[in-house]
Amino acid sequence: MCAAATQDDVVNHTVLLLCSEIQNIGKTTFINKLQPPELRAYLSTCLINPSNMDDLAKIAQSMLINLDEFEGMSGRELNIFKDLVTRKVISIRLPYARRSQNFPHTASFAGTCNYQEVLHDTTGNRRFLCFHVNSMEFIKINYAQLYAQIKYL
């Protein structure tokens, strides 16, 4: 996530999915707290519609996109989404512009779902890292130390 947000040549090809049939255990809260408070302006919570220019712009403007209540997509929708996840640049025609412009893909994706078998893709799901969770335990995070270690790595 950090490398994708700070280096134009890096794209995070993996979508983190937290799955649980248990409601209200903190899946969304966990994802929202992956970023320190100072960077939460770069967090978007939405499902990406590839035909919506505002949604595409979020991929170039956000550090993290929370696909809250991600309940799977049809085959065609999933293929389009997988393409968006791995696309190096996002081409957007800004309002009143004559031509599209290319913007670096800075966003990483994470999401929550309410059942384990959320993906129905016979070609494989290498882009999705699914974790089944039964409970969440929250600890106080020293974001300065965490991000210092990430930068060092």
Q: Predicted regions: what is each one?
A:
Residues 132-153:
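C-terminal, non-catalytic macromolecule-binding modules
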Residues 63-86, 119-124:
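Conserved AAA+/SF3 P-loop NTPase catalytic/coupling segment centered on the Walker-B
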Residues 1-60:
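P-loop NTPase catalytic core of nucleic-acid-dependent motor ATPases
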Residues 119-138:
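A short helix-turn-beta junction within AAA+ P-loop NTPase domains corresponding to the substrate/partner-engaging
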Residues 113-118:
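Short, polar loop motifs at secondary-structure junctions
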